[in-house]
Amino acid sequence: MSLMVVSMACVGFFLLQGAWPHEGVHRKPSLLAHPGPLVKSEETVILQCWSDVRFEHFLLHREGKYKDTLHLIGEHHDGVSKANFSIGPMMQDLAGTYRCYGSVTHSPYQLSAPSDPLDIVITGLYEKPSLSAQPGPTVLAGESVTLSCSSRSSYDMYHLSREGEAHERRFSAGPKVNGTFQADFPLGPATHGGTYRCFGSFRDSPYEWSNSSDPLLVSVTGNPSNSWPSPTEPSSKTGNPRHLHVLIGTSVVKIPFTILLFFLLHRWCSNKKNAAVMDQEPAGNRTVNSEDSDEQDHQEVSYA
């Protein structure tokens, strides 16, 4: 038996005892599920652990299940080291939260930091729920839409997934109404369509889900750029260009009108000021001015 096999066997012994070797020496690897983390009963999923660090060995384990720890020799291609762990046929015992680690040959007891957790869920165990859209599966851009997942089965939790997205949304089921349990998923103002499915699960087995609902295609009509702006975005980003032209035209008209109004107001104030000064002059001065005016008029008559 080679030294490496013995070393990895020792690592496995530590895992069985619930004690990890020294970890966090290297950067954490990444853990992905192919084709995805939702796996139908009896199907197989590939968990790929990879890193740009040249790891010779990868370890995969399920949280709380040290006996399920797996070891693979890493493959190296184009500066990336990876290992593909085949999990299946999928059963309830294989569902759960997984993490992976990397290690190098010369220090097998020094593991990398753990990858981010990855939840593997088994589906297809119970009756499928129903999925509907309010006000309907076809909505205008910017219109609010709510998806409702319901079933006669007493599921504690409902899960909504969108095709092409890894993460799902979950809501607790509401009280029983008209013989059904339901959860509503508000999606907010619609911008892009997509295909949605929902699942049901029970509180004591969160990794075991029902069959998928029938797929629901949500279509968005109209130009998304004309949809309602979000509260954090200025309306000019999503507003109508024609409305912008009207604003510009109104501004062009207002500018000269404001200048003219200011000019007239200035003239009016000046006249008021001159009139006030005339009213405050002494009476004698006004008499002299009147006499001077008469003399000027007389002179003009004499010359005529």
UniProtKB/Swiss-Prot annotation:
Which ranges sit in the Cytoplasmic compartment? 266-304
Q: How does it sit in the membrane?
A: Single-pass type I membrane protein
SUPFAM superfamilies for the chain: Immunoglobulin
Give the transmembrane ranges: 246-265
The UniProt record lists the Ig-like C2-type domain at 42-107, 142-205
Extract the InterPro entries matched here.
Ig-like_dom_sf, Ig-like_fold, Ig-like_Receptors_ImmuneReg, Ig_sub, Immunoglobulin_dom
Q: Where is the signal peptide?
A: 1-21
**Per its record, how is this protein called by name?**
Killer cell immunoglobulin-like receptor 2DS2
| Source organism of the structure | Homo sapiens
The gene name on file is: KIR2DS2
